[in-house]
Amino acid sequence: YYPRPHEDMTKAQVIIPALETLLTISGTLERPVRNIHFQNISFEHTSWMRPSYQGHVTLQGGFHLLDAYKLPIPGLPEKAELENQAWIGRPEAAIQIKCGNNINFNHCTFQHLAATGVDYERAVSTSIVENCHFTDIGGTALLVGTFPDEGFETHVPYTPFHEQELCTGITIRNNLIEEVTNEDWGGVGIGAGYVKNIHIVHN
């Protein structure tokens, strides 16, 4: 960190995040976590160390490459014109939710976060994010739904194995999203993968 001309570091208050994830909600397809409501809570200050240790090649939506290389001889049996291979990774999130029902955020603040803010990753249903403020986020503010699994080859078409894995009935409404994707220009304000009956309204 390089202090600005008016800053005195001997008097500065410094916050160094230690955690990459502040909250994890994780059920199973058979027994989802149900009926959790967060209201008027501020979720702040996360880190994301992977880019520092392993580098970072960004893809669309804030996803990244785990590994990639050029094929010595172009072409594979399933794709004759392919010249390179690459494997996808999903970024860390301050709030990670898998296999949940009725997991809601209302009038919450998400700020000073290194990677993704909130991630409804898989098999989340009938949940609402509304009247929230997302700001100063390094990657995507809000990510919803299944994308290729970790380590999936990026050139291979992806389809979820089971419809149960889809996020369904998610409402994202009346949120203020600003100053996001500050560190990862491949990120977005709101990203939706394989979802069903999603409502994104007035953000």
Question: Where do the model's predicted regions map?
Answer:
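Extracellular polysaccharide-degrading/modifying enzymes targeting complex plant/algal/animal polysaccharides
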Residues: 1-99, 104, 150-155, 159-161
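Short glycine/acidic-rich loop motifs that flank beta-strands on beta-rich extracellular proteins
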Residues: 20, 47-53, 92, 114-120, ...
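Right-handed parallel beta-helix
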Residues: 34-45, 81, 101-115, 124-139, ...
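Small disulfide-bonded, cysteine-rich extracellular recognition modules and tandem repeats
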Residues: 26, 121, 145-147, 180, ...
